UniProtKB/Swiss-Prot annotation:
UniProt entry keywords in alphabetical sequence: Lyase, Pyridoxal phosphate, Schiff base
GO terms under biological process: amino acid metabolic process; pyridoxal phosphate biosynthetic process; pyridoxine biosynthetic process
Name used for this protein in its record: Pyridoxal 5'-phosphate synthase subunit PdxS
GO molecular function terms noted in the UniProt entry: pyridoxal 5'-phosphate synthase (glutamine hydrolysing) activity
The gene coding this protein: pdxS
Binding site for D-ribose 5-phosphate: D66, G195, G256, G277, S278
EC number per UniProt: 4.3.3.6
InterPro entries, sorted: Aldolase_TIM, PdxS/SNZ, PdxS/SNZ_N, RibuloseP-bd_barrel
Reaction it catalyzes: aldehydo-D-ribose 5-phosphate + D-glyceraldehyde 3-phosphate + L-glutamine = pyridoxal 5'-phosphate + L-glutamate + phosphate + 3 H2O + H(+)
Keyword Lyase among record annotations: yes
Amino acid sequence: MRLYELSFAQIEDFFYKLAEVKDIIKDSGLMEFLPELKKLDSTIQTGTTRVKHAFPIFQKGGVVMDITNVQQAQIAEEAGAVAVMVLDKLPYDVRKSGGVARMADPKIIGEVMNSITIPVMAKVRIGHYYEAKLLEALGVDMIDESEVLTPADEEHHINKWEFSVPFVNGARNLGEALRRTVEGASMIRTKGEAGTGNVSEAVKHMKIINSEIRSLISMSEEDRVKKAREYQVPYQLVELTAKIKRLPIVNFAAGGIATPADAALMMWLGADGLFVGSGIFKSQDPDERAKAVVLAAACWEYPEIVLEAQKMISEQKSMMGIDIKSLKPEELLQVRGL
């Protein structure tokens, strides 16, 4: 059976069961006595393509929170975040401070890794191969090649196939999402407009991606070939996307999510999970807001629970948002890395 004949849910279920079996074998002590299993365990650690694409599946339905220090990382873990993303500055502060935004201090990333048990991700500049190599050597669980940081290469993204660690990339539309997939990304996130506390761009980008996938489904083979040329991706990837009626890799929402209602909205629109940046730790109630956003993301199908999550926070303590229309074209982060 070919991969594209399986549903995304079947693939997801397979990886969950595979992880459960591996844990049972390790807990039983059989790994030491069965050389082939031990060899398999060692192979799994090297970051094969299957493992890199499976890792984001385990984050589905959850919230990844941007943090800058150990204290924030611990708040995120306590709130139920599935992972943290380490930055030097939160996106709101990156936007306000200007200058060149780079990878976070490896010492801080290491301290965060040693202080929590959930996965730790970190951002690199678009096209900055060596920042990514440093994070791989450091042992982070995932790398975000992010438009929030100042691009190192205005023309090209990193070739992610050369790495053992999975990557996440931003996208505003289906063409961008599929190009990043061809480059080796294991996860896509809507770009939105980071650091604004304004979810409108994330909504727009998610709707564009969904709409373009629906268009693919109804297209003739000839039109899909033309679309593959337009997107600059292999036809087989376009065909696969139409076949499974979604992106072939996990698609999270990001950019401007600041409240439990925002979180539930993006999940309702079809996001597999969420990245929440400045919305948590630029608010005046980060502990409560972190828990509320996680609850809303997990229970988005139940408005009464999302309502309780919304009651956990105070709108008066939300971060000061930025109207997208007030930003100059050169101030938009989403246009970086097409």
